[in-house]
């Protein structure tokens, strides 16, 4: 699989997570300590995630307000798609929890890989943050996300 395919897979994971966050507010409480808007790809993904996370902190989820933030027609359409990604039918709660966990891990792992590639060799503070992020990733693997 090439870098392009991997990037598309990550974007799909990010869309799925944003869709889940909009459709089930309980999920945010379980992932907020592990995933931040900075874990999303640059551009509209990160911006939309940032606005959504801010709405969670303010206690009022309103995807339409987020979409209205993007005035460019093309961006507006893409953001609408972010919140309405078709998620394959997962029949059991357990399947949903497993898929959610895999999605969160994939996004966090990609975020760490990207930060590692872009890290300046002399950036000790950045290196320290990466080490902490990798430890969080290990903790995250032990976490059980419950959606019922």
Protein language model annotation of sequence segments:
Residues 1-60, 112, 116-119:
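Non-catalytic protein-protein interaction segments used by genome-maintenance enzymes to assemble
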Residues 53-148:
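Bacterial replisome coupling helices
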């Amino acid at each position: 699989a090439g870098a392009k395919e991997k990037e598309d897979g990550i974007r799909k994971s990010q869309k799925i997570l944003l869709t889940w966050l909009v459709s089930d507010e309980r999920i945010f409480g379980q992932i907020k300590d592990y995933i931040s808007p900075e874990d999303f790809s640059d551009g509209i993904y990160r911006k939309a995630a940032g606005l959504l996370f801010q709405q969670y902190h303010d206690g009022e989820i309103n995807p339409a307000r987020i979409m209205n933030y993007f005035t460019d027609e093309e961006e507006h359409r893409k953001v609408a798609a972010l919140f309405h990604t078709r998620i394959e039918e997962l029949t059991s709660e357990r399947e949903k929890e497993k898929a959610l966990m895999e999605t969160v891990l994939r996004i966090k792992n990609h975020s760490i890989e990207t930060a590692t590639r872009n890290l300046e060799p002399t950036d000790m503070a950045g290196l320290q943050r990466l080490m902490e992020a990798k430890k969080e990733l290990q903790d995250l693997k032990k976490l059980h996300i419950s959606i019922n």
